[in-house]
């Protein structure tokens, strides 16, 4: 429902309520999982349950929306990294570092979120893979990334490092250290080539 196009802009209060609901739903799902009661999400957003159901008539609508907007954000991150003037491994660093910094804003299947049933989301997910493949191809051409590295390898690494860890203040520095180690091992001079 939230993706359906309309010929008119939503009222400002409706748009604000939807943003409040999305932020509250993301936080609640990170805190309680995908089965968090819809009433909890509405209460956390400071709106009535009727407002939630006007925007998202069923739990699946909300979950699909959260997954879709998360993939859209990941695509923006991938495109920004691909367009940067850095090396391929630098672009991958930028891409994964963005996922780490946005970990509490993303609801994705590899983060424990639901897979989306929306065809539009599959298209965005495929676009993410294509952009990451372009970065990998750039690295293959300059010899900084081995031939057998795939977009899925990079995406899984990003998902692992971007897991929400609210009680560990040193997690960001640990993630960046692990990222540096992983990216250093992507080079084509490794024994697996």
Language model: regions and residue ranges:
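Basic, helix-initiating cap at the start of DNA-binding domains
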Residues: 1-35, 39-44, 61-64
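C-terminal peripheral helix-coil segments that are non-catalytic and often amphipathic
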Residues: 1-5, 129-148, 167-193
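Generic detection of well-ordered alpha-helical segments
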Residues: 3, 15, 19, 23, ...
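Amphipathic alpha-helical interaction segments
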Residues: 20, 40, 90-98, 153-157, ...
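Helix-turn-helix/winged-helix DNA-binding modules
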Residues: 33-34, 54, 146
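Short hydrophobic/aromatic patch on the recognition helix
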Residues: 46-56
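Short secondary-structure transition hinges
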Residues: 61, 94, 98-134, 159-168
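Hydrophobic alpha-helical connector segments
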Residues: 65, 72, 76-105, 120
């Amino acid at each position: 429902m939230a993706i359906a196009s309309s010929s008119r802009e939503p009222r400002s209060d409706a748009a604000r309520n939807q943003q409040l609901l999305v932020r509250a739903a993301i936080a609640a799902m990170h805190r309680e999982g995908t089965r968090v009661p819809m009433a909890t999400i509405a209460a956390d957003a400071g709106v009535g349950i009727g407002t939630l159901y006007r925007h998202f008539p069923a739990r699946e609508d909300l979950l699909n929306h959260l997954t879709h907007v998360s993939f859209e954000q990941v695509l923006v991150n991938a495109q920004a990294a691909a367009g940067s003037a850095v090396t391929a491994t630098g672009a991958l660093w930028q891409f994964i570092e963005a996922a780490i910094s946005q970990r509490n804003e993303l609801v994705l299947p590899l983060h424990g979120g639901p897979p989306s049933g929306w065809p539009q989301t599959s298209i965005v997910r495929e676009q993410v893979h294509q952009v990451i493949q372009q970065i990998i191809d750039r690295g293959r051409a300059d010899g900084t990334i081995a031939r057998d590295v795939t977009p899925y390898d990079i995406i899984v690494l990003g998902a692992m490092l971007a897991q929400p860890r609210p009680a560990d203040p040193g997690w960001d520095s640990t993630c960046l250290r692990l990222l540096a180690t992983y990216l250093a091992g992507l080079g084509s001079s490794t024994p697996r080539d």
